[in-house]
Amino acid sequence: MRKGLFLLGATVAVLSSCSNQEVMDVADYANQPIEFSTFVGKNTRAGDITQTSFKKFWVFAQNKKVSESDWHNAFTNVQVNKISEGNWSPVNTYFWEANKEFRFAGYANGESQLDENIVSYDASETTTGTYTGVLTFKDYTTDGTNDLVAGMGNANDYTWKGDAGEAPAVEMTFHHMLSKLTFTFKTKMADTYDVD
């Protein structure tokens, strides 16, 4: 009887330690959802998109193993919605992956998603400056109703290296690529003319 109780106690202890480990793993950075924070830069006489009116954008993410050089799509042209001030979340939940470096790029075209043959992202391309990767707009046309803003989320090193704790929000700073402008002309001439 004592032997049976001892085995039962040992089994409970082993099972408890296994479930405790699973709970600890959930707290790791690598299992946390990818979230975003944004800032919209002000352009001189910029159009409609401002920090307060900015409600959604679309994002590309590519990742690679730290030890490799080939980048792969983590997600492509995914809508990200503003939940509250400083709190943004993609429509689908994506998680950080251990030992992978991530690079991000995003855009907003008013309330409209652009087709993937118009906008694309390649994290392996480099440009001058602090950001890496290139967000490309090809054959983009506008009807004049929207501002086009774009931003890169690569100012920080988004690589999980085994640390525990809270995962950082991806910082996206958007800049106006094309802005809707309104021109007002004033004249002292009469509104109507007589033609003889």
Would you name each region that the model predicts?
Residues 2-196:
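Sec-type signal peptide cleavage vicinity
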